[in-house]
């Protein structure tokens, strides 16, 4: 019996040791004007919160592996925050009017260096812009010189991002730049394939991977993907994309939001083609995404929208169609096949004229 007890005790000790997880203690300092404000710590699908007291706050927890997190603080009209790496140790986040800095742990120090280099590049570009303005150049000369300065800045930024990814593709920091470097699915896949598990498993990278997969599923020539918004109709009843698409008409679906300037700018074009083609062969449907219903309803009072609108669609449609920017205007054929994506302005008018006649 004693022997069994001794062995059991050793086994329990080993199990306990095996269950030990890295811990972090994140301390932060901020202007005392934020005293009493809620501080949010967001990472992946997890979150934590605390309150600023005497210009300070802290978070403590366990992690399986280093993870990127955002710290957000708001007090009235004042907002601040920064990105940190939650990793074993005691990182210290300092928030000032000039920006933020997190020190005290290896990956956070690496991130500081990258942020400093990025800021230096932007500073150089801003100085070039100011210098050009002061030279009194003619408009054409100014635009040409500014374009050259912009190209230099873009090339420098890409080089910095490429070097940072190469040096950090096996830790979570590599996930910061992989989406910046990828211009399309092919480039994303190439970067993803050489990245380590820490980068591949990062929430932002998984989201981008899913977006490209959904973008492929909803590319031109593919059948439409249906979705239902439970209170999406004007009356607050369920409405589906299939209520309109695949019913024998060409249907132009505009994914938009009330706060989106380019979305509003496209409305006159949509109103023009709707007036011209509305009927047995053509319909427009607006899908309000990333927007509050009340804001959409208010916007409709001043916009030339006379076509059906699906309200309060949130992120569901944009996820399904791989959309990361609006407006996104997609044309569906009479059978529900996707005819074209990214239609705007004159290109939109020309495509409809081709299909429906002038």
Question: Could you say what each language-model-derived stretch is?
Answer:
Residues 52, 232-233, 332-333:
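Short, acidic, Ser/Thr-enriched surface-loop or helix-capping motifs
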Residues 17-159:
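A non-transmembrane, solvent-exposed segment enriched in polar/low-complexity residues
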Residues 299-305, 312-357:
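Thiol/disulfide oxidoreductase modules built on the thioredoxin-like
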Residues 1-15:
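Sec-dependent bacterial lipoprotein signal peptides
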Residues 228-251:
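A short beta-strand-turn-helix
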Residues 79, 91-93, 101, 143, ...:
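N-terminal targeting signals for export/organelle localization
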Residues 264-303, 310-320, 350:
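Structural microenvironment flanking redox-active thiols in thiol-disulfide oxidoreductases
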Residues 248-251, 255-259, 325:
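Short pre-active-site segment immediately N-terminal to redox-active cysteine/selenocysteine motifs
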